[in-house]
Amino acid sequence: MNAISNRREFLRTAALAGAGLTLSSPLLGTKPKTVLVFTKSSGWEHDVVKRIGGKPCIVDDAVNDLGNKLGFNVGVTKDGRIFESKEFHSYVGVVFFTTGDLTTLGTDGKPPMTVKGKQTLLDAVRGGMGFAGVHAASDTFHTQPDPPDRSNRYIAHGENEDPYLRMVGAEFITHGRDEDPRLQTANVIVNDPKFPGLGGVTSPVSFMEEWYSLKDFAPDMHVILTLDTHTMNGACYQRAPYPVTWARTHGKGRVFYTAMGDRPENWKNEFFLNLLGGGIRWTIGDASAQLEENLKQAAPGYAEIPPKQAPEK
């Protein structure tokens, strides 16, 4: 399918997604792989996933453009019912930019997943479906209980962590505050310059972002990028460098996660888009990578948890 017809189909599926589920794109002659972009916000709704005036959100548009460039089709939805539909099994991979407990209606008011739907997702990934998590995908399905003071997020849960987060590879604790400031330019260390999308990138890379502070890292992960915290401001960064992008296998499935992607302008950044495109391609089997477990080597102090902060009002 050429880019023009693929774009037309994408706009059609995006329009359908406002009311319900999406349709995967047909192909002319062949049948390229199709990924589902899921952007339900049961917690905080980021600007990049807001649909304004019935138009696709920034994330939907950007992933579709990557698909046009890299050769995969895209379906989009905020409707959690899709995970119990026949359509869900037509996708070879999913891209998550989500927040909160997705089994609740939450902030955006879109239909939630069910507990069964969540398990269907987990089983699908373990069975071979690709999963690419972006930014707030680690701020989703927090290990319970998750009280208002967020105290449980400062505890290492290990094998008791929510199974969704165990699949993703880590859990969001918090991020910098406005006075830190919230958005900071920091260096990321490229631990694997051969990972798809990173060809020719030299380390470190300077990048402005709302940097997530993370914990409960999967011990079997292959770290791709590490955040250099030494020059950063804010209590949540008073810790040793830690992973902010990685890949791992989960059963037969491939999981990629990057903590980047908060700011709208970053969805036009070449480094970020190349990284995300490479990650998606790897999760659906269109790109290869050698994944050695390197957590302890890439980030020896990964297990440090920063001092607890009271939630922002």
What are these regions (language model features)?
Residues 5, 37, 45-133, 137-141:
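Helical hinge/lid and interdomain linker segments adjacent to catalytic or ligand-binding clefts
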Residues 39, 59, 69, 78, ...:
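Extracellular ligand-binding/catalytic regions of CAZymes and related secreted enzymes
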Residues 101-196:
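A glycine-rich, often tryptophan-bearing local segment used as a flexible ligand/cofactor-contacting loop or short
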Residues 2, 9-29:
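N-terminal export signals
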